[in-house]
């Protein structure tokens, strides 16, 4: 009997030892799925990354074409309206065969203005990204529309207002142009690009007038009007705001989806 009793206790001891050995087996079994499952996400992440990288260039080019078309169309329409306004006020004079056309303007003026608007509108957000200074001041379409209205008003004032001399008119339009920049832009890149655009556009206009393509009435500054750089400056700021707003809508689409 003692031997049987000892044998029973030995069996119970071995049975009691099994529960102590089970957690180790369970821990080992629990570690196996982690080890086998760990490499699984590794091949998935490169595939997702390559798919995203492959989709980005196509979407970026598609967005670039869309923004270019919108800016080009805006430049064409604005050129037709503002140029017609200046012709009616006898500020800009074209040859007689040009005035006989349906739009009372040279055929090359709207395409050139549209191309310039597309270049300027794409350049503004590009310069902002390179400088690392994203423009976030008044980023809504209502502000952009007000900026367009102010720019049209400045151009209308240049053709309609009568001052004692051109210096007073130029100073007034310069103050209005700087006020437009301060109200709707307030960025150093916008100020620098606006001044650069005004300088280059004035040189191109002087070249065209000097070669007899068209002319201005009462020129007072190297064959042109002295207030013309102010118009180019405010136009550059306006088109730049449109380009920034169009570029700002691009990253918002994935978040909305």
From Swiss-Prot:
Gene responsible for this protein: INSIG1
Principal localisation: endoplasmic reticulum
Cytoplasmic-side positions: 1-64, 125-139, 185-189, 244-257
Keywords associated with the record: Cholesterol metabolism, Endoplasmic reticulum, Isopeptide bond, Lipid metabolism, Lipid-binding, Membrane, Phosphoprotein, Steroid metabolism, Sterol metabolism, Transmembrane, Transmembrane helix, Ubl conjugation
Residue span of region Disordered: 32-54
UniProt membrane topology term: Multi-pass membrane protein
PTM statement from Swiss-Prot or TrEMBL: Phosphorylation at Ser-187 by PCK1 reduces binding to oxysterol, disrupting the interaction between INSIG1 and SCAP, thereby promoting nuclear translocation of SREBP proteins (SREBF1/SREBP1 or SREBF2/SREBP2) and subsequent transcription of downstream lipogenesis-related genes.
An annotated GO BP: SREBP-SCAP complex retention in endoplasmic reticulum
Subunit structure and binding partners: Interacts with SCAP; interaction is direct and only takes place in the presence of sterols; it prevents interaction between SCAP and the coat protein complex II (COPII). Associates with the SCAP-SREBP complex (composed of SCAP and SREBF1/SREBP1 or SREBF2/SREBP2); association is mediated via its interaction with SCAP and only takes place in the presence of sterols. Interaction with SCAP is mutually exclusive with PAQR3.
Domain-related comment: The KxHxx motif mediates association with the coatomer complex. Binds oxysterols in a pocket within their transmembrane domains and interacts with SCAP via transmembrane domains 3 and 4.
GO-annotated molecular function: oxysterol binding
Motif (KxHxx): 251-257
Residue intervals on the Extracellular side: 88-106, 163-165, 212-225
InterPro entries noted in UniProt: INSIG_fam
Keyword flag Chaperone: no
Pfam families: INSIG
UniProt protein name: Insulin-induced gene 1 protein
Required for the recognition of 25-hydroxycholesterol, annotated site positions: 151
Positions of crosslink type Glycyl lysine isopeptide (Lys-Gly) (interchain with G-Cter in ubiquitin): 136, 138
């Amino acid at each position: 009997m003692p031997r049987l009793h000892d044998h029973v206790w030995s069996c119970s001891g071995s049975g009691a030892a099994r529960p102590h050995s089970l957690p180790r087996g369970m821990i080992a079994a629990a570690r196996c799925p982690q080890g086998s499952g760990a490499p699984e996400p590794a091949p998935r992440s490169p595939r997702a990354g390559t798919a995203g990288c492959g989709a980005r260039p196509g979407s970026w080019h598609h967005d670039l074409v869309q923004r270019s078309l919108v800016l080009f169309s805006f430049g064409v329409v604005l050129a037709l309206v503002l140029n017609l306004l200046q012709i009616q006020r006898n500020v800009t004079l074209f040859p007689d065969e040009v005035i006989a056309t349906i739009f009372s303007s040279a055929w090359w003026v709207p395409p050139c203005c549209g191309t310039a608007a597309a270049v300027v509108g794409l350049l503004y957000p590009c310069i902002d990204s390179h400088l690392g200074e994203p423009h976030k001041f008044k980023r809504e379409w209502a502000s952009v529309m007000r900026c367009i209205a102010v720019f049209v008003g400045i151009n209308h004032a240049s053709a309609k207002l009568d001052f004692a001399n051109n210096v007073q008119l130029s100073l007034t339009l310069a103050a209005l142009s700087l006020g437009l920049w301060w109200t709707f832009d307030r960025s150093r890149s916008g100020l620098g690009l606006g001044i650069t655009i005004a300088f280059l556009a004035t040189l191109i206009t002087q070249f065209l007038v000097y070669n007899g393509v068209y002319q201005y009435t009462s020129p007072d500054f190297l064959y042109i009007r002295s207030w013309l750089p102010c118009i180019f400056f405010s136009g550059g700021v306006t088109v730049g705001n449109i380009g920034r707003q169009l570029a700002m809508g691009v990253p918002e689409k994935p978040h909305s989806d």
